[in-house]
Design a protein with these regions (language model features):
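A conserved catalytic-core segment of Leloir-type glycosyltransferases
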Residues: 42-134, 138
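A short, active-site helix/loop in glycosyltransferases that binds the activated sugar's phosphate group
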Residues: 211-241
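Short N-terminal targeting/anchoring amphipathic segment
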Residues: 92-99, 144-165, 177-181
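Conserved catalytic-core segment of nucleotide-activated headgroup transferases in glycan assembly
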Residues: 250-299
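Membrane-proximal helix-turn-helix segments that form the acceptor-binding/catalytic region
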Residues: 142-145, 164-167, 171-175, 200-219
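Carbohydrate-associated surface elements
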Residues: 225, 245-248
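Nucleotide-sugar donor phosphate/pyrophosphate-binding loop at the beta->alpha transition
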Residues: 176-181, 190-211, 251
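N-terminal subdomain of nucleotide-sugar transferases
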Residues: 1-80, 85, 218, 227, ...
């Protein structure tokens, strides 16, 4: 088997946000270990800021961009040549001309709240199904088949969320026979924030998850806890092809041993959600104020 692997994700540099870095660093270090990653991503970024310097770390990796139109009024307006209202464009404009007053924004948002609620209702239940990347699927499958043929791909790798990534991987596997590795960065239909609260949409998302476990040649999870969750959900049927691959620290960012500080730090990495409230902080404060702290592991 050759070492040509197709990495499929809508989240890749120059985008810079939490969902980017698992696939991004995987690509970087696969290349160093003798693999030949080829990336398939989106050609438009509507929601995230960008850092073009990130691409310097994967300069020699082929990156293909399949056509993606956001299924929103914004996506339609931009497609028809309207103003670029992506987050990166708005942020750049704000830096140039200055942000508007908060009072003006508040009045505007109040006036639009009724329409906004109706608009979101339509999007969540009828348009963005199974998610907002639904209109990326067709072009990604078409381009993916071409890449598989031209680069003699031996493995397809997708990372979820979004659910659409799994649909793309599944279709490419069925169309080409190439082995498919389905990665889960989140416990999808188990975690409330990850799936739709509208049952017909949730049912479609659940079906995608079920088919993923059924047809993927291997399942990988960001956390060992996720694999335990999936093992319980599917009664152990897929445990023989499920693997835990943690998201590690990029060694290039670590200081040399000689330059490391002697002090130890406790660092929280990730999102601290509103739902967490202050439970962790209370426990942490008690631990810090206790008479003894024990450390375990490598420092």
């Amino acid at each position: 088997m050759n070492k040509n692997i197709l990495i499929i994700t809508p989240f890749f540099p120059p985008q810079t946000h939490a969902a980017v870095f698992r696939a991004f660093k995987l690509v970087k270090y696969l290349k160093r270990t003798g693999w030949n990653p080829i990336v398939l991503t989106v050609n438009r970024n509507y929601l995230y800021l960008e850092d073009p310097d990130l691409l310097d770390e994967v300069q020699d990796v082929p990156i293909y961009q399949a056509n993606y139109i956001e299924p929103t009024l914004r996506g339609l307006r931009m497609l028809l040549g309207g103003e670029d209202t992506s987050l990166k464009a708005i942020t750049a404009k704000a830096k140039t001309i200055g942000a508007q007053s908060k009072s003006t924004d508040t009045v505007t948002s109040n006036k639009q709240s009724l329409f906004g609620k109706f608009y979101k209702y339509i999007l969540d239940r009828w348009i963005q199904v199974p998610d907002r990347f639904r209109f990326w699927e067709r072009s990604a499958v078409r381009m993916g088949r071409k890449i598989i043929k031209e680069h003699d791909i031996s493995i397809i790798y997708t990372t979820c969320l979004p659910f659409t990534s799994n649909r793309i991987g599944m279709r490419l596997k069925h169309l080409t026979g190439v082995k498919w590795v389905a990665d889960f960065r989140d416990p999808t239909t188990y975690a409330k924030r990850m799936y739709s609260d509208y049952f017909p949409v949730f049912a479609k998302q659940k079906k995608i998850e079920q088919d993923t476990f059924k047809y993927a040649d291997a399942i990988t999870g960001l956390s060992g806890a996720y694999l335990n969750i999936f093992n319980d959900l599917y009664e152990g049927r897929y445990s023989n092809k499920s693997y835990f691959i943690p998201t590690g620290v990029d060694d290039d960012y670590l200081p040399s041993f000689q330059n490391r500080e002697k002090e130890n730090y406790i660092i929280f990495v990730g999102e601290y959600l509103h739902e967490y409230k202050d439970n962790f902080l209370k426990i942490f404060a008690e631990a810090v104020n206790s008479k003894e702290l024990k450390g375990k592991g490598c420092t």
